[in-house]
Amino acid sequence: MNEKIRSQSVLNTLETFFIKENHYDMQREESSIVNACLRYLGYSKSMCHEKMPIFMDIAFIEYCFNLSLDPSSFQNLPITQTQPDSQQILWEYSLISNALERLENIELERQNCMREDGLVKYTNELLLNKETLNNEALKLYSCAKAGICRWMAFHFLEQEPIDHINFTKFLQDWGSHNEKEMEALQRLSKHKIRKRLIYVSQHKKKMPWSKFNSVLSRYIQCTKLQLEVFCDYDFKQREIVKMLTSNIN
């Protein structure tokens, strides 16, 4: 069985979990099967440019970056146990490139859904909330994408020897958010490992992964809420909002 056929078979398996119900609960018994499928598709080159349903793209991002979006998972836990750890993420070139592509697909689908809904049924207040949510999602998406790119670049710079071919390709594909910064990283890659490690250590302190993890989590939550409120998706997001509100009160 060639890779494309195998990938399609895995995709069909995932469809039974996501498509039929418009959402997926990662606490369910089948979560290990879903995780295995997502992991396989993350490495499948034949799937890199395949359009997947937004539910599956979101699930892949949550899995790939170890996001915990359920507030109940944070209850009764010491703060040290809720801090995101970059070491729990597999900073592998093909996987992160695929994740960035999935993240881009989510944003495109989100924007399409927001444009296509029927505006006539909404009050002025709801339309104002829609615009506010949309602006927030755009900012969060831009920041999250830039953070993932930086941390993947950090991983490349920590390696000895550096994989210059994939490093250059990664910067060309995903570094357009800040060309000057990417050019500086490219120059740094030609220095010895000691200088690279000093640079990475300093910048990891300035831009910790916990910051970008928080931004990415908020972006996914914001996207789910928009799709649920304005486009009739069902991510159980309203239940999460209720839980957060009750905790604050």
Curated annotation (Swiss-Prot):
Record bears the keyword Acetylation: no
Gene name as annotated: poz1
Binding partners and assembly: Interacts with pot1, rap1 and tpz1.
This protein's name: Protection of telomeres protein poz1
Organism in which the protein naturally occurs: Schizosaccharomyces pombe (strain 972 / ATCC 24843) (Fission yeast)
Subcellular location: Cytoplasm; Nucleus; Chromosome, Telomere
GO biological process: telomere capping; telomere maintenance; telomere maintenance via telomere lengthening; telomere organization
Domain of life: Eukaryota
GO molecular function, one term: DNA binding
Functional description taken from the UniProt entry: Telomeric DNA-binding protein that negatively regulates telomerase and telomere length.
UniProt keyword Acyltransferase, yes or no: no
Any Gene Ontology CC annotation: chromosome, telomeric repeat region
Alphabetical keyword list: Chromosome, Cytoplasm, DNA-binding, Nucleus, Telomere
